[in-house]
């Protein structure tokens, strides 16, 4: 009969520690395993695919238990972190063999989604940002950090719109918030399955202030203090590598909201969710992990300062002109490891011997990189060469101290080079001489006993011993051999001489290992003192890496240097190409297009059949702008561009069902973002606005939006539409120009030219698109007959309402032109159906329904 057991001292200790971390999985170290208990064990066994067992199985209340081996713990932690959980690592704080009573245990680190510094394969070029948000009367103080690299930045945001843009740009998984947070703010911040972590009012940190003297805004200082208090409380170790907070303004960069980033496939492909076939993947010829991260930042935050853009362009041009020097630079960069994260591991105390060798190898490349900079022409490179600190003292220290091929463990010896420390060398000599003595003893015992198979062995349990097979036991001399252990086929013995020598050897080995670890810690501390120098060098190398990447891609893809101008918003792109589509199709297969929008053109109204390339044309301009303002060369024959402050997009259909929003609601929300926030210096891309609702509603909204943008916003706008009636707006809107994607019919077949031409499209090609999709010939013939009948019966097509006189007030988006009444409901339905906007399946379903109604009659 099971018996109820009282709480054991160990479970009492576990429960006391668990109570301090109720929202985390507690990994409780017992020997070589981390154990999970109770609810943690039940949930952990499911998530981690562990065997669920129990402690005290015979009791009425057995305790659920599951465990993971200590050497593989990180992989299990990563799984829980990926699911959005926190993990508290509880270690044994003393040697169990020497402990009196219960072994002391304590949580040494709380790993969270925003603080995980273990970088998985394939993620080296990505940041893991943790953010902090502190609402105040005028907006939101906002800070973010990457614990693995030491980056720390802060700003003050004036609106929820600005806050959402920053959160999406950083792709943060965890947000630190104060205790007092409204439900409205909490709901907004949790979008995208972000984890909210509450940090009570923070006292100044014991490590010193992370707030620089230049940071004078009290709200910004407070949010930095809150974030750093959380990091220090969770990491429970030195964060000396985290730099003082740098203030920034999002408005100092080209701003893009979440929709623009997604629609343009800048960092992530919107269709696959992966990084392939994106602007980032195309431009990434970086050789270092830190260069890859900086490239993402440059693409995510293109510049507004025309002088800063020019500096980058000059550097790219110089590298482009010096092929051999660029090749030498690339060769050296491939041997540079992740200096930022190596510095972080040094500060964390998790650096090992192999990490230090990687650091030394990286630093050894710097003199050669400086030589390359000296051969380039641009003055900024020569200035960089003189400022670049090779940190040669750290490289020299590691070269003198650390074995070239050290073990992973830092506690088992074998790390420190001979000659670095005399005392360590003497211990090693003692061990070497003693082992020689052991070998000589083995030879003499074999000779004395006549047992040729006699061996002197060692293991951690019994130490040194003499092993003799049972067939030779009769040859053992009496009185001198003391039996130690009996095996199936052998006996193990010790002798007084062997026991004495064992003590000397083990003492020397233990002293050697302890001294070696102390020496390694001292070396680590010396490197830690130079972290700021290493971080400065990392920033310089990262920038060089991105610049050479831009130059390499420009050369391979035949990009040109764009001309940037301020003061006007004129666009002159000739022979422009969509960089990613061109890469996929091949340059010879891609058809380039011009985008000409001077002072008398604010809007291009784009018409043409589906699948003809309207969306590609629109995205092409936006990507060229982003590349140019990031400092890259661009895919065009000529590119003369203004400086844009924001990009807004509405491209493609997408529901947000998780938030209860239909395609049309998403469409209107995205349109409203541009209408509310765009300026005359912005770029707007609207694709098929109004298609998510009924025809007349959609056309009315599209026309009203066009008029509002034209009359009130004055931003450069590319607006594609399937409402051909809207093309007549060019008669009343002076700065609207019609363009269309060319297509020709050859022998009854439609051929897309993928070329943008002036003027509106002269007809719809919906039936031809349906033919390309492979719909049945009879169905297509019937659709063609219906179309001709419609065109004959309804010669007076619905025209757009006259454009109103421009007034300095917001236009109503919900006043639509009244539809012309029809005699037949079926004809009314036909008149409203736009074949060009329909997919082949839409057309087939429509014709099927139409036939059903006619047959009933």
UniProtKB/Swiss-Prot annotation:
The keyword Heme does not apply. Keywords: ATP-binding, DNA damage, DNA repair, DNA-binding, Nucleotide-binding. It holds the Pfam family MutS_I. Coiled coil: none annotated. One of its GO terms (molecular function) is mismatched DNA binding. It comes from the Bacteria. This protein is involved in the repair of mismatches in DNA. It is possible that it carries out the mismatch recognition step. This protein has a weak ATPase activity. This is DNA mismatch repair protein MutS. ATP binds at residues 608-615. One of its GO terms (cellular component) is cytosol. The gene is mutS. GO terms for biological process: mismatch repair. SMART domains: MUTSac, MUTSd. Belongs to the DNA mismatch repair MutS family.
């Amino acid at each position: 009969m099971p018996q109820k057991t009282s709480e054991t001292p160990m479970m009492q200790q576990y429960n006391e520690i668990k109570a301090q971390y109720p929202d985390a999985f507690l990994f409780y170290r017992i020997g070589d395993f981390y154990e999970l208990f109770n609810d943690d064990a039940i949930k952990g066994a499911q998530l981690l695919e562990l065997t669920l067992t129990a402690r005290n199985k015979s009791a009425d209340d057995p305790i659920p238990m599951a465990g993971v081996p200590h050497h593989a713990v990180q992989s299990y932690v990563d799984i829980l972190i990926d699911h959005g959980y926190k993990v508290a690592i509880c270690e044994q704080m003393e040697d169990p063999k020497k402990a009196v009573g219960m072994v002391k245990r304590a949580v040494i680190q709380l790993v969270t989604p925003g603080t995980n510094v273990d970088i998985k394969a394939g993620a080296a070029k990505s940041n893991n940002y943790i953010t902090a948000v502190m609402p105040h009367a005028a907006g939101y103080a906002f800070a973010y950090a990457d614990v693995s690299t030491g980056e720390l930045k802060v700003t003050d945001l004036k609106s929820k719109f600005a806050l959402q843009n920053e959160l999406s740009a950083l792709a943060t998984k965890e947000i630190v918030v104060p205790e007092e947070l409204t439900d409205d703010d909490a709901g907004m911040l949790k979008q995208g399955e972000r984890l909210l972590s509450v940090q009570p009012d923070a006292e100044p940190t014991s490590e010193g202030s992370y707030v620089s003297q230049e940071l004078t805004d009290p709200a910004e200082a407070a949010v930095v203090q809150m974030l750093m208090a959380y990091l220090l409380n969770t990491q429970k170790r030195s964060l000396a590598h985290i730099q003082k907070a740098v203030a920034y303004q999002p408005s100092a960069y080209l701003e893009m909201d979440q929709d623009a980033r997604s629609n343009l496939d800048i960092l992530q492909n919107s269709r696959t969710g992966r990084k392939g076939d994106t602007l980032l993947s195309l431009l990434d010829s970086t050789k270092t992990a830190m260069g890859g991260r900086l490239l993402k930042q440059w693409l995510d935050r293109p510049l507004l300062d025309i002088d800063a853009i020019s500096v980058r362009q000059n550097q790219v041009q110089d590298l482009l002109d010096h092929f051999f020097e660029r090749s030498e630079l690339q060769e050296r960069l491939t041997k540079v490891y992740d200096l930022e994260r190596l510095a972080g591991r040094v500060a964390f105390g998790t650096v090992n011997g192999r990490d230090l060798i990687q650091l030394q190898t990286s630093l050894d490349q710097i003199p050669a990189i400086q030589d390359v900079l000296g051969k380039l022409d641009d003055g900024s490179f020569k200035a960089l060469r003189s400022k670049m600190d090779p940190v040669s003292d750290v490289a020299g220290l590691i070269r003198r101290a650390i074995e070239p091929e050290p073990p992973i463990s830092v506690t088992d010896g074998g790390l420190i080079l001979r000659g670095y420390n005399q005392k360590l060398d003497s211990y090693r000599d003692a061990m070497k001489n003693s082992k020689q003595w052991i070998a000589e003893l083995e030879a003499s015992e074999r000779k004395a006993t006549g047992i040729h198979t006699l061996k002197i062995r060692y293991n951690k349990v019994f130490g040194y011993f003499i092993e003799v097979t049972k067939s030779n036991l009769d040859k053992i001399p009496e009185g001198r051999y003391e039996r130690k252990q009996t095996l199936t086929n052998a006996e193990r013995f010790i002798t007084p001489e062997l026991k004495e020598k064992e003590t000397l050897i083990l003492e020397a080995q233990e002293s050697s290992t302890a001294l070696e670890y102390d020496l390694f810690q001292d070396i680590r501390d010396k490197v830690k003192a130079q972290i700021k120098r290493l971080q400065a060098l990392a920033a310089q190398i990262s920038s060089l890496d991105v610049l050479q990447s831009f130059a390499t891609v420009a050369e391979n893809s035949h990009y040109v240097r764009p001309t940037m101008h301020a003061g006007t918003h004129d666009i002159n792109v000739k022979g422009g190409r969509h960089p990613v589509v061109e890469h996929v199709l091949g340059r010879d297969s891609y058809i380039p297009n011009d985008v000409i929008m001077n002072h008398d053109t604010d809007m291009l109204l784009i018409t043409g059949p589906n699948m003809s390339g309207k969306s590609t044309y629109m995205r092409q301009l936006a990507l060229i702008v982003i590349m140019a303002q990031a400092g890259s060369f661009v895919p065009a024959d000529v590119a003369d561009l203004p400086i844009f402050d924001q990009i807004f997009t509405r491209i493609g259909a997408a529901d947000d069902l998780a938030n209860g929003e239909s395609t049309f609601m998403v469409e209107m929300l995205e349109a409203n973002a541009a209408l509310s926030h765009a300026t005359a210096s912005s770029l707007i891309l609207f694709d098929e606005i109004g298609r998510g609702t009924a025809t007349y509603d959609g056309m009315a909204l599209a026309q009203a939006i066009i008029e509002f943008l034209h009359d009130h916003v004055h931003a450069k706008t590319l607006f594609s539409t399937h409402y051909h009636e809207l093309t007549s707006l060019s008669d009343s809107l002076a700065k609207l120009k019609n363009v269309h994607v060319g297509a020709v019919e050859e022998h009854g077949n439609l051929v897309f030219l993928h070329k943008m031409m002036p003027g509106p499209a002269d007809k719809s090609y919906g039936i031809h698109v349906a033919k390309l999709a492979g719909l049945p010939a009879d169905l297509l013939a019937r659709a063609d007959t219906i179309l001709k009948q419609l065109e004959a019966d309804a010669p007076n097509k619905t025209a757009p309402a006259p454009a109103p006189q421009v007034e300095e007030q917001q236009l109503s988006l919900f006043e639509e032109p009244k539809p012309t009444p029809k005699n037949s409901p079926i004809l009314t339905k036909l008149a409203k159906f736009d074949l060009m906007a329909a997919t082949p399946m839409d057309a087939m379903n429509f014709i099927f329904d139409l036939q059903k109604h006619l047959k009933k009659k």
